[in-house]
Amino acid sequence: MARRRRPERREILPDPRFGDVVLSKFMNSVMLDGKKSVAESIVYGALEAVEARAKKEPLGVFHEALANIRPNIEVRSRRVGGATYQVPVEVRPDRAQALAIRWLITAARNRSETTMAARLSGELLDASNNRGNAVKKREDTHRMAEANRAFSHYRW
């Protein structure tokens, strides 16, 4: 573990087409093996498909989908006297965004459409309408936290 100060966070540049930092982070998460141009074509293709299918502004649908997936509370394991408790804790905004992005991409990759752009557009549309596997993951997380509410006094 580093003994010095924490390194400052790198500033992520906004994406070239929409000028949005969150979309840029999303693209970086979609990227595999450092192939940014492939990730860009997938994400932009998905956003174009969203625009064609939903007749809505694609960036708005993207942000709405992320807002619907973003968790407010999660459970973390805490060991107390030989027993491990699942303690519900609030999620920091930056972690909530990271989890939402991760869950959205995982849900899209598990879909059955042919191309990744089609899978991503389908999951974005589902998530913006409060459906789909990514939203289900958020609901499951909230349900877990609610079920373990009795252990909330073990917060740290």
From Swiss-Prot:
Q: Which keywords has UniProt assigned to this entry?
A: Ribonucleoprotein, Ribosomal protein, RNA-binding, rRNA-binding, tRNA-binding
- Organism equals Sphingopyxis alaskensis (strain DSM 13593 / LMG 18877 / RB2256)
Protein name as annotated? Small ribosomal subunit protein uS7
What broad taxonomic lineage does this protein's source fall under?
Answer: Bacteria, Pseudomonadati, Pseudomonadota, Alphaproteobacteria, Sphingomonadales
Q: Pfam families attached here?
A: Ribosomal_S7
Question: Per the record's keyword annotation, is Transport included, yes or no?
Answer: no
Q: Which GO terms describe its cellular component?
A: small ribosomal subunit
Single biological process term from Gene Ontology: translation
Question: What is the role of the protein in this entry?
Answer: One of the primary rRNA binding proteins, it binds directly to 16S rRNA where it nucleates assembly of the head domain of the 30S subunit. Is located at the subunit interface close to the decoding center, probably blocks exit of the E-site tRNA.
Q: Extract the NCBIfam families matched here.
A: rpsG_bact
Its family remark reads:
Belongs to the universal ribosomal protein uS7 family.
**What CDD domains does the database record attribute to this sequence?**
uS7_Bacteria
